[in-house]
Amino acid sequence: MSHRLLLFTLLLLSGIFSSHTLASGSRAEKKVEWKKTDLHQGYALLYGIAEKQKSVDMLLIVKNASTPTAALIKEISRTYGELHGYLKPLAINGQLVAKSSNGLPLAETSSRDRIQRIKTEQLLSRSGAFFDLTLLSTQVEALTYSSALLSHIAEQDPSSANKENALAYQQKLDGLLKKIWQQIEKLQKAG
């Protein structure tokens, strides 16, 4: 499979070209008011992602990535480690956020666990540029989701300090996302 076809496939899989976006262009989002439990669950979801992502660099112990990809993965891991440390003691209006209560139904959490196992198997079975592209595509998904979640959290959290922190982490993740796309482009040109 050519690198160009692989890149296009990765873009499709990561949701960059959804059929809705291709058909209708971008749309303005509707602003929805969250309940107090929604904000707590949003933080719990973010905490769960940070919990997993802070260790993504452990994959580099058993798999070899190119030097630029490995450096980027380590930076992603460090950033999620910082986010995890910030979220761990987080409270809203004096109430500690329950990190295990993300509000997702069992069908969703079971499906997410299965997807994670499948992606791990895929990563372990790949090597070279194909491994780099596959690994980077998983990070596109995680960073895009986390960034969107942080944006919504910043809109809804009544604490100005929490809003500022959410927006600061969103900027960091968006910066990492930009670096990932640059690395994917370099890999595609090299292939």
Regions found by a protein language model. Name each.
Residues 8-16:
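Bacterial N-terminal signal peptides
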Residues 1-7:
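Bacterial N-terminal signal peptides that target proteins for export
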Residues 22-191:
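His/Met- and acidic-residue-enriched segments that coordinate or traffic transition-metal cofactors
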